[in-house]
Amino acid sequence: MTTHYIAGSWQAGQGEALQSLNPVTQAVVWQGQGADASQVDAAVLAARQAFPAWAQLSLEARIDVLEKFAEQLKQHSEALAYCIGEETGKPLWESATEVTSMVNKVAISIQSYRERTGEKSGPLADATAVLRHKPHGVVAVFGPYNFPGHLPNGHIVPALLAGNCVVFKPSELTPKVAELTVNCWIAAGLPAGVLNLVQGARETGVALAANPGIDGLFFTGSSRTGNLLHQQFAGRPDKILALEMGGNNPLVVDGVKDLDAAVYTIIQSAFISAGQRCTCARRLLVPQGAWGDALVIRLVEVCKSITVGAFDQQPAPFMGSVISLQAARALVAAQSELLAKGATQLLEMTQPQADAALLTPGIIDVTAVADRPDEEFFGPLLQVIRYADFDAAIDEANNTQYGLAAGLLSDSRARYQYFWLRSRAGIVNWNKQLTGAASSAPFGGIGASGNHRASAYYAADYCAYPVASLETASLALPATLTPGVTL
């Protein structure tokens, strides 16, 4: 059974039973047993033993392996895209773009490493000042289920490039994607022990996070789990912790001329990936009055016709399923709780089939809800809040513990500049979907949304630490000795 990849060999798990399911059909996609604590220990030890040789390779030698990995991804792109769709439920057109992002991450990471963490030097009067960067050592990477290939790849690629060795624990909901990805690394010639895969759920994750042999942990996932990791690593300045978490993201709509363009951008912001992107719009802030009424009516009208279906359905749907039946039922329950608090249903989010994790888009007006929960409802549920003036909209947009993404739809550049200056988020977009971000730019947020800028251009910053040196080829006395010293 090919479950875990440790020290260059595949082995069966010794922990709890695991299986991943197709979210729509509930067919078993993958099954095995998770890694127990002893296997996690073995993976960390294998990474530690592989570290000296990998770190001492030239940068060009490591780049060569990364570029071969990118070629393997291209060769297996169809199989990877199919697997991503099958395990996550996202349509094939969307899972194919994820594989493309994985390929592109290699070149971006190489560029980022050279520009942000390469070697720099400059002359001084009697020496040379040199800045170099060194890898941390052994790092754990925890991956999410919503982008099971792209997001962990955004940690793993720059970590390996910098000279680290990795122990990778993917989401227990998407183990097959992780297995296929690791096979691409093996085919690229990555030495044994440099990348180790441990599958598993909570038991495996707890063992890996607590292992004293790791020098850092790179995490993408929920704020709840990220906060627990932050508490666990408190008082451990010797460990590097990079967290990319969620958001209760606001999208503010100003009066724009093209109503349908606004509606389309809202749909792309709120409902792409069935609302399972950390940057998806969760709160839609709409001005009070006739124009705002017309926008909401048109949005509801268009959303009624959005197609929802299985990942391989033809013609292709816009939305696939959410990750699991459990997730679907939790979202329907969250909608009911908001209604009980006084919200108004504009478009009901429904689960058409009780045995499938398919949900239709939901739109709910929560303006009248006094105690709106500051939560990330990770699915196709959009909350509408009506505002009286632009300053009130900005105040409401910032009324969250999170700070990942925020956006403005407006025909006024002055409005955008005003919004940008006051917006509390790591990503601020103007007249573009909230889920859009340039891979060549930093990605991440502030507050409860995380600390470092994970899985993108600034990932190089936390994958290596700077070493400043003063250097001269020969030791010599200075021209003038300091007072009080006689030779």
Curated annotation (Swiss-Prot):
<dbReference type="InterPro" id="IPR016161">
    <property type="entry name" value="Ald_DH/histidinol_DH"/>
</dbReference>
<feature type="active site">
    <location>
        <position position="244"/>
    </location>
</feature>
<keyword id="KW-0056">Arginine metabolism</keyword>
<comment type="similarity">
    <text>Belongs to the aldehyde dehydrogenase family. AstD subfamily.</text>
</comment>
<dbReference type="Pfam" id="PF00171">
    <property type="entry name" value="Aldedh"/>
</dbReference>
<keyword id="KW-0560">Oxidoreductase</keyword>
<keyword id="KW-0520">NAD</keyword>
<dbReference type="InterPro" id="IPR029510">
    <property type="entry name" value="Ald_DH_CS_GLU"/>
</dbReference>
<dbReference type="InterPro" id="IPR017649">
    <property type="entry name" value="SuccinylGlu_semiald_DH_AstD"/>
</dbReference>
<dbReference type="InterPro" id="IPR015590">
    <property type="entry name" value="Aldehyde_DH_dom"/>
</dbReference>
<dbReference type="GO" id="GO:0043824">
    <property type="term" value="F:succinylglutamate-semialdehyde dehydrogenase activity"/>
</dbReference>
<dbReference type="GO" id="GO:0019544">
    <property type="term" value="P:arginine catabolic process to glutamate"/>
</dbReference>
<dbReference type="InterPro" id="IPR016163">
    <property type="entry name" value="Ald_DH_C"/>
</dbReference>
<protein>
    <recommendedName>
        <fullName>N-succinylglutamate 5-semialdehyde dehydrogenase</fullName>
        <ecNumber>1.2.1.71</ecNumber>
    </recommendedName>
</protein>
<dbReference type="GO" id="GO:0019545">
    <property type="term" value="P:arginine catabolic process to succinate"/>
</dbReference>
<feature type="binding site">
    <location>
        <begin position="221"/>
        <end position="226"/>
    </location>
    <ligand>
        <name>NAD(+)</name>
    </ligand>
</feature>
<comment type="function">
    <text>Catalyzes the NAD-dependent reduction of succinylglutamate semialdehyde into succinylglutamate.</text>
</comment>
<dbReference type="InterPro" id="IPR016160">
    <property type="entry name" value="Ald_DH_CS_CYS"/>
</dbReference>
<comment type="pathway">
    <text>Amino-acid degradation; L-arginine degradation via AST pathway; L-glutamate and succinate from L-arginine: step 4/5.</text>
</comment>
<dbReference type="InterPro" id="IPR016162">
    <property type="entry name" value="Ald_DH_N"/>
</dbReference>
<feature type="active site">
    <location>
        <position position="278"/>
    </location>
</feature>
